[in-house]
UniProtKB/Swiss-Prot annotation:
Cited Pfam families: ECF-ribofla_trS
NCBIfam families given in the database record: PRK13661.1
Keywords: Cell membrane, Membrane, Transmembrane, Transmembrane helix
Gene3D superfamilies with a match to the protein in the record: 1.10.1760.20
Subcellular location: Cell membrane
Organism field: Leuconostoc mesenteroides subsp. mesenteroides (strain ATCC 8293 / DSM 20343 / BCRC 11652 / CCM 1803 / JCM 6124 / NCDO 523 / NBRC 100496 / NCIMB 8023 / NCTC 12954 / NRRL B-1118 / 37Y)
Source superkingdom: Bacteria
Membrane-protein topology: Multi-pass membrane protein
Descriptive protein name: UPF0397 protein LEUM_1974
Keyword presence, Disulfide bond: no
Length: 187
């Protein structure tokens, strides 16, 4: 009988990262939310954290951290708003696709990679907050289009800024804390 050595599911490291990532995401989203003036839309520093977690662990962990963290946060206010929970999951998934070109574990984050990441996060924000969230609000909750697209536009702008500032700082700080692949030599 031939044994199948193919890995399935998430690694222990990814499961732990998901749990810790979602817990920190919840704390940041719940307790460090800055109102924008648009109803139910805040400057969300948790999105900067999601950029680091997704960039380190990839799209599956990014998706799970966004969905779990947002669901728990919404549950503390009464009930999850599923269209925005899904949008956060999509955002985490899209940010996680940056793992390949960022290579944060390698200890080298060039200006070019950081610019590429920020261009990608702008695209990911537009998809999540100007497409997924408003269309979900219309389809699931029968919300007026003018309201939800205003909320989506505000969320897009503030989340782009949150990830560009907080996310970039976290990415750079993480890489500076890691040895470069070429810095260790055997003797």
């Amino acid at each position: 009988m031939k044994e199948n050595n193919k890995k399935t599911g998430l690694s222990v490291r990814s499961v732990v990262a998901t749990g810790i990532g979602a817990a920190v995401f919840f704390i940041l989203m719940k307790y460090i939310a800055i109102p924008t003036g648009v109803p139910n839309t805040n400057v969300n520093v948790a999105e900067g954290w999601l950029a680091l977690i997704a960039g380190l662990f990839g799209p599956v962990v990014g998706f799970l951290v966004g969905v779990i963290g947002h669901t728990i946060t919404d549950a503390t206010y009464g009930a999850p708003w599923w269209s925005w929970v899904l949008a956060d999951g999509v955002f985490g998934l899209l940010l996680g696709l940056s793992k390949r070109f960022l290579d944060l574990e390698g200890g080298d984050l060039s200006t070019k990679k950081l610019v590429q990441f920020n261009v990608w996060q702008i695209i990911a924000n537009v998809i999540a907050w100007l497409i997924v969230a408003p269309i979900g609000d219309i389809l699931i909750y029968k919300q007026p289009a003018s309201k939800v697209f205003l909320q989506g536009a505000a969320a897009t702008i503030v989340n782009i800024l949150s990830v560009a500032i907080i996310g970039s700082i976290l990415l750079v700080a993480y890489v500076k804390s890691r040895p470069k692949k070429s810095s260790l030599r055997s003797e």
